[in-house]
């Protein structure tokens, strides 16, 4: 939706100032919102987090054009309704931390969605441009069935992350799945725990920025029972 400009000095205005450009860092959208027009967050360069309900029915084209800083999505899911989450993810190609909540606000899953980017490469003999995709993030953006996230499909993509992404990315993705094991099978749990045990060097790097992250991660990797689900 288009935002009105801020008033000139001395000019009166009603309501809140425009939320646009470098002023928006975190935006929370109401449950009653059903439509966002084209280029709704155009050039919100400092936007980092977006909280929204999955029931938004219409998202305009170019919704996040110029929003390369978005790094966190917090979505409240409405049961038995079409979800807009796949469309939102399709508009953002960067690495994203995704929190999924039920209608009461309780966290049901925390996921890491890796990045991807596309580039046009010239095929000189054929005189055509070939679109090449880099990174495994595009695969994660298709882990949906009838707009609902499919955890088994998400977990099945972990081998791609291990090959194409940095160890820190793979470790954080694994930690999220162990911390919130919604739909996590025993075989998938094993693959995540095995990766963390085989890459102890990531503990040191992660510990520099989040000591609690390190402590809880170590507990999960060392335990032999079920994954722990915290209250966040």
What do the predicted segments below correspond to?
Residues 1-13, 20-35, 45-58, 68-187, ...:
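Structural signature of tandem-repeat unit edges
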Residues 217-220:
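Conserved hydrophobic site in ankyrin repeats
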Residues 35, 212-215:
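Structural detector for tandem alpha-solenoid helical repeats, activating at a conserved register
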């Amino acid at each position: 939706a288009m935002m009105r400009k801020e008033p000139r000095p001395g000019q009166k205005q009603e309501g809140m100032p425009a939320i646009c450009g470098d002023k928006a860092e975190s935006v929370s959208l109401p449950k009653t919102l059903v439509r966002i027009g084209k280029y709704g967050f155009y050039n919100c360069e400092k936007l980092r987090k977006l909280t929204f309900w999955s029931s938004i029915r219409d998202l305009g084209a170019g919704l996040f054009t110029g929003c390369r800083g978005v790094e966190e999505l917090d979505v409240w899911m409405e049961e038995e309704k079409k979800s807009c989450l796949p469309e939102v993810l399709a508009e953002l190609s960067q690495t994203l931390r995704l929190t999924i909540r039920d209608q009461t606000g309780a966290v049901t899953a925390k996921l890491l969605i890796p990045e991807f980017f596309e580039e046009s490469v010239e095929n000189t003999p054929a005189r055509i441009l070939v679109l090449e995709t880099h990174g495994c993030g595009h695969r994660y953006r298709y882990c949906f069935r009838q707009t609902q996230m499919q955890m088994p499909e998400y977990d099945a993509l972990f081998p791609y992350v291990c090959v194409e992404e940095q160890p820190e990315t793979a470790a954080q993705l694994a930690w999220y799945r162990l911390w919130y094991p919604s739909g996590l099978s025993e075989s998938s749990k094993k693959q995540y725990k095995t990766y963390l045990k085989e890459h102890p060097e990531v503990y040191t790097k992660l510990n520099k920025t989040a000591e609690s992250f390190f402590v809880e991660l170590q507990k999960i990797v060392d335990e032999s029972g079920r994954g722990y689900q915290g209250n966040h």
